[in-house]
Regions:
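Hydrophobic alpha-helical scaffolding
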Residues: 67, 82-83, 138, 150-158, ...
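Short conserved micro-motifs at the rims of enzyme active sites and ligand-binding pockets
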Residues: 89-90, 116, 136-139, 156-157, ...
Length: 553
């Protein structure tokens, strides 16, 4: 998945995290453990080590078994709402698709994954509902949740995601464990119960107070919320911030209003304020990591303090503020594992943030670079900067896979590939573009894939605006696109948008789409020409800086 280093809500992958979620899901921890390979690999036990990231699935397929920190290379892939053309290294991706034993695409649209593989079998398309054909909660980037209603019944044979998941769980034999506290109507789990289960477990981020009932109340009374600060003025949700942006501490019954702005100590915790989390201990190398002389207003502790635990409540004399039921649940627990929410409730009643009050961490001692520093890209036209700003050494295993840095950067490709290539977004399209390029009004606005080239470079190459050109990346991937000659890019730099797909290295794949399902606009995927490179902390792919050559087609 996108964050393969943690269970939901940043609990991590240690045994305690699995035990927490086993309690939330009401399944036996040993049963969960028994579903994992118990072999110790370079990265450790698979259950407790980060998985292969979505950015590296290609290498998860193509690497030899003995090079991977798990039993075998990947044999099957689910592309669930995933745009493969938004990932780098297109030619290697096609090879990986061909090596897989099975591909499953779950999406309202066939997507590029359904047509670029060049396979004749082992590919399954599962039509998923759009947002208009299902109901439930969604979370926006400001951390607010919204409840949405179904507009129309699912078209054709499409199904909502949670029903598809349930049907898969049935086939795999763990549907009962998946839905132990979730009502299932026919084959469709009740979406409200799914959110309630999320609320029951995600204490770390305060995704616990946003019950379906509270979100529906917000939905019905949109008009009572301010467009300026999101807060309701009167009405049933008086004082709440719209969508109860997380952290919305405690249980729904505690009625925390949500936190519209993170790390604001000028507001009481009970009203959405907080300091920085005491996430990294209380001291390091003799330096106090807790806040000094700073705390959220109206709190009974006016200095730094660690994360709240049952023992901390006892030491402060606040333990008896818990109900008897809360005491039974909180004994031996902390603010993020107490399923009653009592520890959070009592801390907040005393004006304290449950996660503690610490200093912001500027020196990240767990990262390869403890403070940000420039490292020259693996592929660069500035070879003079490589010695001054070298990349990292290769990693034997990172997120289960060998990850290359220095061994790539040591090779000088700049004579053959003299132009820096970057990629990015357009206003008209989103992501891999499958949905937006299938909308006639948007498709009319951007009908062709292109590369932006500086006028000086165009003159040096011998091309004009509107010419068809080949853009070849430093690993040999090529795209056939129109040249847009413009000073918007600097001399020696080219730009391509990444929203296009359906043409692969000059080959039009239109006929491979199911009848009537091809987008209005097809084009080369920019990432066919992009190259290897991954951030060592997150394994995020390098899409912004590689090198290329451009020539007339």
């Amino acid at each position: 998945g996108l964050d393969s280093s943690s269970l939901p809500a940043y609990y991590g992958l240690a045994e305690g995290a699995w035990q927490h979620w086993a309690r939330v899901w009401d399944v036996d921890y040993e049963w969960l453990k028994g579903r994992f390979d118990q072999t110790e690999y370079h990265d450790g036990l698979p259950m407790n080590s980060s998985g292969i990231t979505v950015s590296r699935w290609v290498d998860g397929v193509l690497e030899e078994d003995e090079a991977i920190s798990q039993r075998t290379a990947l044999k099957a892939m689910f592309y669930w709402g995933h745009a493969v053309n938004s990932q780098t290294r297109g030619p290697e991706m096609r090879r990986a698709m061909q090596k897989l034993e099975m591909m499953v695409i779950v999406d309202p649209y066939p997507t590029v994954a359904a047509v670029m593989h060049d396979r004749t079998d082992g590919v399954y398309l599962l039509p998923a509902c759009t947002q208009f054909e299902t109901t439930g909660s969604v979370t926006a980037t400001n951390r607010s949740l919204q409840w949405r209603d179904k507009v129309i019944e699912p078209l054709f044979e499409s199904k909502p995601d949670h029903e598809i998941m349930y049907l898969l769980a049935e086939k795999f034999g763990f549907a009962e464990e998946l839905t132990r506290h979730i009502q299932v109507n026919g084959k469709e789990p009740l979406i409200e119960d799914i959110l309630r289960e999320i609320n029951r477990g995600t204490w770390t981020i305060g995704y616990t107070g946003q019950s379906p009932e509270r979100l529906k109340e917000h939905q019905k009374h949109w008009h009572t919320f301010s467009f300026e600060d999101l807060r309701a003025e009167g009405g049933p949700a008086d004082g709440d911030y719209y969508g109860l942006p997380w952290p919305c501490w405690g249980t729904p019954e505690f009625a925390h209003p949500g936190s519209p702005n993170l790390y604001d100590p000028s507001v009481p915790v009970k009203e959405g304020g907080m300091g920085f989390r005491a996430r990294f201990g209380i001291e390091r190398n003799g330096v106090n990591l807790l806040a000094e002389g700073s705390a959220p207003v109206a709190g009974e502790l006016d200095d730094g303090y660690p994360e709240f635990t049952d023992q901390m409540l006892k030491d402060l004399g606040w333990w008896d503020d818990l109900t008897d039921e809360e005491k039974a649940a909180a004994e031996g627990e902390n603010w993020k594992t107490d399923l009653s929410g009592g520890i959070q409730r009592v801390a907040i009643e005393h004006g304290c943030a449950p996660y503690g009050n610490a200093k912001a961490r500027a020196v990240v001692w767990t990262f390869p670079d403890q403070v940000p520093k420039h490292r020259e890209p693996l592929y660069t036209t500035r070879r003079d900067l490589v010695e001054q700003f070298p990349t990292w050494d290769d990693f034997r295993s990172l997120f289960r896979l060998p990850t290359l840095y220095r061994s790539i950067q040591e090779n000088d490709n700049s004579d053959r590939y003299p132009i820096i290539l970057t990629s990015g977004r357009l206003v008209e399209y989103e992501g891999g573009g499958e949905e937006t390029r299938s909308m006639s009004w948007l498709a009319e606005l951007q009908q062709e894939m292109f590369v932006e080239v500086n006028p000086a470079d165009a003159n040096d190459i011998g091309i004009r605006d509107g010419d068809t050109v080949w853009v070849e990346g430093a690993e040999g991937g090529r795209v056939r696109v129109k040249a847009l000659v413009t000073p918007r890019v600097g001399r020696g730099v080219a730009f391509m948008p990444f929203h296009f797909g359906g043409i692969f290295q000059g080959e039009n794949l239109h006929d491979r789409y199911p009848e009537g399902a091809a987008p209005y606009v097809l084009g080369e995927a920019a990432n066919t020409a992009t190259t290897y490179g991954y951030d060592p902390v997150t394994l995020m792919q390098e899409t912004k800086c590689t090198i290329c050559r451009i020539e007339r087609a």
